[in-house]
Amino acid sequence: MSAEQEGRIRVTEYLNLDIERERWMCNRCGREIGPARENYKKGCLLYDRDPREIHPPLVSGEFNFSPDPLWVRIVEIYCPGCGTQIETEYLPPGHPITHDIEFDLDNLKERLRKGEFVIRAQRLEAAE
């Protein structure tokens, strides 16, 4: 692991948190996505998909097992640097993008400083 990655923890498969700089980072290309005190999705590329493209009708007619775009939308969230798909959301039309990950950065930094937690191989662990 490079020295610049030492202060990062892996949050999801494709998303890292740089604790010292308080930035969201793409795990694949290292691109800064945005401030860690905000929703990381604000710095990503969003693709609002028609659910019928993803789940094509299985049978003809009104009841065809395909999601109705009047009831659901599919939003794909991509890294603006490398295009890796970070997340997918199924939302009601008009519903804002969810803010699903939020850390208490001040508390986390304090606990790291005190030695209660350590970062090993991009994982946050309790100190021994």
Identify the function of each model-found stretch.
Residues 19-21, 71-74:
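Flanking scaffold residues of small Cys/His-coordinated metal-binding clusters
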Residues 77-78, 110:
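Phosphate-end processing signature that detects enzymes handling 5′-triphosphorylated RNA
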Residues 1-13, 27, 31-68, 91-93, ...:
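Short recognition patches in nucleic-acid-associated and regulatory proteins
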Residues 34, 82-87:
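Short loop/beta submotifs within extracellular cysteine-rich repeat domains
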Residues 1-17, 93-128:
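Short, intrinsically disordered terminal segments enriched in charged and Pro/Gly residues
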Residues 25-30, 79-82:
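Short cysteine-rich clusters marking metal-coordination/redox-active sites
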Residues 72-76, 83-85:
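Extracellular structured ligand-interaction cores
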